[in-house]
C-alpha cells in the first residue's frame, strides 16, 4: 500500500467522532453523540491502522496483530478493544456523577429552592395544582428545547460559513464563565458548608490559577489527563446549576425531551447534528475540544487559519499528537515535527480515542443529582447510576454493530427515568415496610 492509497482510504472511510485526527462536530448541547474508532480498510471496529510518521503507509501494530490472528480470533480482539472503550467511558462518567452526588448530599445550597429560575423556564410550577404544574412543566420544556434547536441552527450556519473565530470566541466565553464564576460560587458554598476560613485575595488567587490553567488546557495545549479533568469539572458545575435552578417536574420532562431531540438530531438525514458531522467530514477538520470529552488528545491550534496550506499539516500533527503531514516535508516543518515524537503504541492509543459529548455528562449527572436531591434515598440514586451505565454499555454495543455516530442520551436516560420512578414508587416503600416490621429477606 502506498501513501496515496492509505490517505484516500482514511479520508473516504472515516466516521464521525472517530479518531483524534478525524473531524468531529460541535453542537449546542455539546453533541450528545459518541463513536468508536473503526478500521479504515475493513470497516471493523476492532483495530485501527496506524500511519507512520513519515507517511510510508506501513501497517501499524494492530494491523500486524490482525494479520497474525486467525479469523476465529478476530472477535476476541474486537471484544478486547471494546471492553477497553467501555472502561475509558465509565471512569469519567462515574467521576462526574460522583462529584455531583457528593455535592448534593453535603452542600445544601444546591438543594435549597430560592424561587429563582433560569430564563429558559419562565413558567412557575404550582405544587397545589397537579394539572397546572404538569402544563407549566411541559411549557418550560418546549421553551428549553426551542432554545436548543435555535442555537444549534445558529451553530450549523456559523460552521457552514467557516466562522470559526466566532465559534471559538463563543466557547471561550462559556468556559470563562464556568471556570471562574461558577467555580467561585462552588468553592464559596463548599467553604461555608465545611466552615473553612479563607480571605478573598487567597480565594481569588486560587480561582485565577484554576481558571487560567483550565483555559489553556481546553482551548490550547496541555496534558491529556488535566484536560480530561477540567472537562469533567465543568460538566459537574453545569449539572449542579441545572439541578438547583430547574423546577422539579420540568427537570424530569426536559430529560425525556432532550433524549428524543438527541435521537432526531443525530440520526435523521437532515438533523442538525448530523449535518454538522457531514460538513466536518467533507472538510477534514478537527473538533472543538471544549465540546467533547476525548480519551485522546485534541488540540485546537490554527483551526481558524483554514486557507493556509501549511495549517492542514499542522492540524494533522496536533490533532493526533503524533501525526505528520504525509509525503515530503519542508525544512520549515521538520523541526516542528521533531518536537513531538511518540511511540507507535501511543499513536495507536490516541487514534483509538473514544469521544463523548459534554452534554451527555451534564444530563447524566442531572438525572442522578435530581434523584439524590428529591428522593434522598441511596437505593434510588444507585439505581439511576446503574441504569445510566447499562444504557452506556448498550449504546457502545450498538456502536460496534452500526459503526457510525450514535446519540448517547436516549438509552441511558430512558433506563434512568424508568429505574428512578420504579425504585422511588415501588422499591423504596417496600424496603421501608420491611424495615418497619423488622422483616429480613
UniProtKB/Swiss-Prot annotation:
A motif (PAL) lies at residues 407-409. It is found in: Endoplasmic reticulum membrane; Golgi apparatus membrane. The active site is at residues 262, 360. One of its GO terms (biological process) is somite development. Its main location: endoplasmic reticulum. InterPro entries: Peptidase_A22A (IPR001108), Preselin/SPP (IPR006639), Presenilin_C (IPR042524). The keyword Lipid metabolism does not apply. It holds the Pfam family Presenilin. Residues 45-60 have a biased composition (Low complexity). The chain crosses the membrane at residues 86-106, 138-158, 166-186, 200-220, 226-246, 249-269, 356-376, 382-402. Residues 407-427 dip into the membrane without crossing it. Residues 107-137, 187-199, 247-248, 377-381 are lumenal. While the protein appears only from 6 hours of development, the transcript is maternally derived and ubiquitously expressed during early embryonic development, suggesting that its translation is strictly regulated. Probable catalytic subunit of the gamma-secretase complex, an endoprotease complex that catalyzes the intramembrane cleavage of integral membrane proteins such as Notch receptors. The PAL motif is required for normal active site conformation. Belongs to the peptidase A22A family. This is Presenilin-2. It comes from Danio rerio (Zebrafish). The lineage of its organism: Eukaryota, Metazoa, Chordata, Craniata, Vertebrata. The gene is psen2.
